[in-house]
A protein has these predicted regions:
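Rhodanese-like catalytic fold shared by cysteine-dependent sulfurtransferases
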Residues: 1-19, 27-69, 80-128
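Conserved G/P- and acidic residue-centered "switch" motifs that form tight phosphate/ATP-binding loops
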Residues: 23, 77
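Short, surface-exposed ligand- or partner-binding patches at beta-edge/loop junctions that are enriched
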Residues: 72-73
Length: 128
């Protein structure tokens, strides 16, 4: 799995229309915090227990198949990295992780979207 900075991921998605962009955050994050424009939501973990979604692999096989590149994003890049390693173990050969995720790393005041991340970098996003 390769890590891409948010702007690199955006450029990759623009130049590879066959790639599938997956937001693997929880449903609440996806709906209320906002999400990258064009991303498909398939939660890796979700509330209330935050267990790995037992349907994740099945949903991914429907959305992407193992023949298409997959770009994963979460809040900070950690859950999407876990999901990416899981996909690689299950036969997905071309998986990319968006480093720093949608909201980015926390600053000294414990706020996100102030240092890095998809939203911080001014990339297209929307809120439902």
């Amino acid at each position: 799995m390769k890590n891409l900075e948010p702007k690199e991921a955006y450029a990759y998605l623009q130049s590879h229309p066959e790639a599938v962009f997956i937001d693997c955050r929880s449903e609440i994050e996806y709906l209320f915090v906002g999400h990258p424009a064009g991303a498909i939501h398939i939660a890796w973990q979700d509330s209330p227990d935050w267990d790995v979604n037992p349907d994740f692999l099945g949903h991914m096989r429907i959305a992407a198949s193992v023949n298409r590149p997959v770009v994963l994003i979460c809040r900070s890049g950690r859950r999407s990295a876990d999901a990416g390693r899981y996909l690689e173990k299950h036969g997905f050969p071309e998986v990319y992780n968006v480093a720093h995720g949608f909201e980015g790393d926390m600053d000294e005041a414990r706020h996100r979207s102030t240092r890095n991340g998809w939203r911080h970098d001014g990339l297209p996003w929307e809120q439902t």
